[in-house]
Amino acid sequence: RFVFDLPEGTSSGLTVASALVCKASKEGECVNDKGKPVIRPYTPVTAPDVEGKLELLIKHYKGGAFTEHIFGLKAGDSVAMKGPIPKHPWKANEFESVGFIVGGSGVTPAWQILQAIDANPQDKTKATLIFANVTEEDILLRKEFEDLAARKPEQFQVHFVLDKPPSGWKGPTGYVNSEVVKEAFKKFNTTPESNVKIFVCGPPGQVKAICGPKKSMKDQGELTGTLAELQYKKEQV
């Protein structure tokens, strides 16, 4: 977790759901082989109205150009940020229920929307999170998700899926397939026949298996994979 100070009395003001892009704040630092700044998108995990700070959740990938740079920063150092980069403009009660199928650090956009639902007493949208990881130690924001589901079980539920589970693990294992999705979405009736939206975010291989390669930021493209098998429509993903 990286916490950045904002000017006193100000907040990020980002829309839900949206991201921002980061680069090194000093010219000449963290550049590619053409001398251009390395730029990476991240989704903040602090709510847009939180004053005085902005928090990013970043996984350390060895050899990652910007990852190595940001993990080398010290307290008091800065990062150049620009945004927002809008994704899905969240509207309370637009859908009866939503499903999130995510992997790794792809969980941060889901957390941004879940926080928005939780913070709005008028938003009755029900939400299911399917979060795939390799090991139990890889689960980001686990406590936050479990606390949310425990506090409002009638509105939120969480399913962790592990590829390499520890002994005694009771949750789903292996890859996220149609059976895992169908079972997880059953409680809140998140079915193709209902008023639903499914959000998918994670490594390219996972995204392709779940819904097919995305055409653009705002266009799913042809729907294939697990969600197509379950008869969801392109407009629902």
Regions found by a protein language model. Give the residues of each.
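Ferredoxin-reductase
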Residues: 1-77, 133-135, 163-164
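Short, conserved phosphate/pyrophosphate- and ester-handling motifs at nucleotide-, phospho-/glycolipid
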Residues: 17, 106, 203
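Short coil/loop residues immediately preceding or within conserved phosphate-binding loops
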Residues: 39, 95-96
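A short, basic/flexible loop-to-alpha-helix module at the beginning of a structural domain
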Residues: 83-94
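Structural motif
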Residues: 97-99, 128, 197
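Hydrophobic/small residue at the entry helix of a nucleotide-binding pocket
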Residues: 105-110, 206
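Histidine-anchored nucleotide/phosphate-binding helix
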Residues: 109-121
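Reductase modules of NAD(P)H-dependent flavoproteins
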Residues: 130-237
